[in-house]
Amino acid sequence: MKYFFSLPFPKVHTTCKHTAAATASQPLQKIRERLESGPGFQEFVQNPSYNREDWSAYEGKLKREKGEQDRLRLPPWLKTKIPMGKNFSRIKDQLRELKLATVCEEAKCPNIGECWGGGEHGTQTATIMLMGDTCTRGCRFCSVKTARAPPPLDPDEPKKTASAIASWGLDYIVLTSVDRDDLPDGGSNHIAETIREIKRQNPRIFVECLAPDFRGNLDCIRTVATSGLDVYAHNIETVESLTPFVRDRRAEYRQSLKCLASVKEINPNMVTKTSIMLGLGETDEQVEQTMKDLRAVGVDCLTLGQYMQPTKRHLKVIEYVTPEKFKHWETRGNELGFLYTASGPLVRSSYKAGEFFITSILKNRAAAAAEEATATKPSE
């Protein structure tokens, strides 16, 4: 005998295809509405949810422990606006047309939007990088291209640079350069010629130059220091113990100190300037000693800023230093006797915020020199 079992049929829910489509589109529509009413990309970059005067509430991780491989997340105080605007585009187009390199782009400076766009000071500027965009050294923090034999110098660069600067109508300009160890004079004559041409086209402008160490060659340093330059800058970059690890092996801590000391020997009235990066693993005691070493060789102006890893192949950030700690170093710099100390996460050696203070120093010195010359002039 055959037995037949009756099995229950599964329940099937049916809906009209138009109803199903409408139901599926509801969550999508809600997402679209949230995107339209929510913050834009610019707001994510600027991260306005934090009070930029007080970062004490920030709870993110700021320091990598020994052995950790993961990169730290960028804290909110280091997030900047996306560069844009008419001024930014105009200055970029002009530099391209003249085939001039800038440290702003090559070093991926976070302040490019403010400097090229005008920022709070209203005057746009760029830091011209002389002698091309390729360096003979390979510092582990720097994103500038490197090669043993870079292209030859452009003989028209001094005039093109001076013309661009003259068109900007500035009263202060910062020049920098790559290292050119492949040249007998390290490029010192090329730099000096550029400074002279800038002064020829605009005698009233103040010129600051962030110069190489020229392997400690005193003649090269003298060539630049006696070119009509107003501010001679050379960066110490980091503390002594980290120098072999951070900088190219040809760049030595004591050699940099000697360069800065030599400038003062050549011209005691020359304003000298240098910069220190923080966040590479240095201790407070090492930073303090570096500042004392710099004062011992007569350095006038000091800037301290946060090291930021430009690409994955460069040194990782060990620590993101807080704005409060940077403020401490600014106070300490003033106590040690620097004429000017700029210290902050986004401060860079060529950042224009310090130009106004240095300009006043130079103008006051010029006025004092003129007054002294008048006082000592024999009466007829």
Curated annotation (Swiss-Prot):
Highest taxon of source: Eukaryota
Q: What is its main location?
A: mitochondrion
List the record's Gene Ontology CC terms alphabetically.
Answer: mitochondrion
From the UniProt record, which GO molecular function terms apply?
4 iron, 4 sulfur cluster binding; lipoate synthase activity; metal ion binding
Q: Which CDD domains match?
A: Radical_SAM (cd01335)
Q: What SUPFAM superfamilies would the database entry show?
A: Radical SAM enzymes (SSF102114)
Q: Where does [4Fe-4S] cluster 2 bind?
A: 135, 139, 142
Keyword Oxidoreductase assigned: no
> Cofactor binding mode, per the note?
Binds 2 [4Fe-4S] clusters per subunit. One cluster is coordinated with 3 cysteines and an exchangeable S-adenosyl-L-methionine.
- Cofactor dependency: [4Fe-4S] cluster
Catalyses which reaction?
[[Fe-S] cluster scaffold protein carrying a second [4Fe-4S](2+) cluster] + N(6)-octanoyl-L-lysyl-[protein] + 2 oxidized [2Fe-2S]-[ferredoxin] + 2 S-adenosyl-L-methionine + 4 H(+) = [[Fe-S] cluster scaffold protein] + N(6)-[(R)-dihydrolipoyl]-L-lysyl-[protein] + 4 Fe(3+) + 2 hydrogen sulfide + 2 5'-deoxyadenosine + 2 L-methionine + 2 reduced [2Fe-2S]-[ferredoxin]
- Domain Radical SAM core: where? 120-339
Could you identify this protein by its name? Lipoyl synthase, mitochondrial
**Entry-linked HAMAP family:** Lipoyl_synth (MF_00206)
Which keywords belong to this entry?
Answer: 4Fe-4S, Iron, Iron-sulfur, Metal-binding, Mitochondrion, S-adenosyl-L-methionine, Transferase
Q: What is its EC number?
A: 2.8.1.8
> Quick check: keyword 4Fe-4S in the entry?
yes
Q: What else is known?
A: This protein may be expected to contain an N-terminal transit peptide but none has been predicted.
Q: Which InterPro entries match?
A: Aldolase_TIM, Elp3/MiaA/NifB-like_rSAM, LIAS_N, Lipoyl_synth, rSAM
